[in-house]
């Protein structure tokens, strides 16, 4: 029996990783990288620059913030609607920065565009944090917006401004914002030292505010942010996450001491196989573990143990898996928009594989051993699934390959562009485009949708928003993955 239990996980792992899909024809990762970054230009809010490449988009929401006497123009729409949610926007910016920090050297000419994508986010976050003791965390009323189907250029729904402050704390969104600014300061350290210092100084101030005035922003702003980007996981992980990035960016002892002192209090070891805009636990442990593996910080050893636990928890074929894999090989987590989990967790696998390689280490996982090569193979399998190696034979990236989603849940993409239809298209008038069986008239190149369900089935239909809606935080970690595989299409 012992022999059988040892062999079966190995066979299952081999089947998931090495069975050649009959639908595979190899992938142009460089092209996919270019498109994954181009997607962010389709999500831009505010005054568009002269070098805007997706020409069907135009200026929008130029007066955002005016009702509160501030300028909050710019930034990104999070998904297929016209709201600017600060929590996922900050996480998107953090992950774009981490993608560049770890994999920018392999992005070639696309590195320049990736850096631009980061700066579009940080320029907005600097506006949102310009007043000490205040963070503007949302522009737009989600209920009003979701009751309409309008392109952003025509938007006439409520542009209500929401903020956190000392009396109405939000350590989660403030901690993530601090992380984003700190991570981006590393990206700009050599490219623009003055801008980098501004980002780091602001990150320091925002983190101090998040830490001193503790609380979840969904308690302060429940009716505005829930159920859309409610903090379901608590704010503790964002405080550790923000401190980890500030430590990496500043190398100040105070942040190291904060992390060590608060590891247990802020629950670094909780839900170690989760990572996304709401839950940073796995990301914290992988990020901090790099220093342990580089031999620089033995006092963080427990974070490496947590990171090893994360790795073992998501290996296909492990005895007690904490994630599921579809028959087609896709990593599946409960809830909607599954591709956000696929790209975020795959990013961590790839990042950790590189850290292990430099340290010449592996992760023992009971009957299996997670080598750096194995982790890269798992991550690459997920990327290849997204790009078309799946039972549907469908690329889940718009504009990549011959077959991809044509009816994505996205207002700007599905409603005729301003150049094609110059007159205003009103709130309810847009419903006919939402309900239309026709493909979207504007190609949101590079958008990765929520993806198939556990049976590998996908309805190419706008009303199925959990599967057909793209988000910025699906693409942000994918940029790093594609940056790596564009230069390393085979693993060793």
From Swiss-Prot:
Residues 1-24 form the signal peptide. The active site is at residues 81, 409, 460, 469. It is found in: Secreted. Keywords: Carbohydrate metabolism, Cell wall biogenesis/degradation, Cellulose degradation, Glycoprotein, Glycosidase, Hydrolase, Polysaccharide degradation, Secreted, Signal. It catalyses: Endohydrolysis of (1->4)-beta-D-glucosidic linkages in cellulose, lichenin and cereal beta-D-glucans. GO terms for molecular function: cellulase activity. Disulfide bonds: none annotated. Its EC number is 3.2.1.4. Belongs to the glycosyl hydrolase 9 (cellulase E) family. This is Endoglucanase 8. The lineage of its organism: Eukaryota, Viridiplantae, Streptophyta, Embryophyta, Tracheophyta. The gene is CEL1.
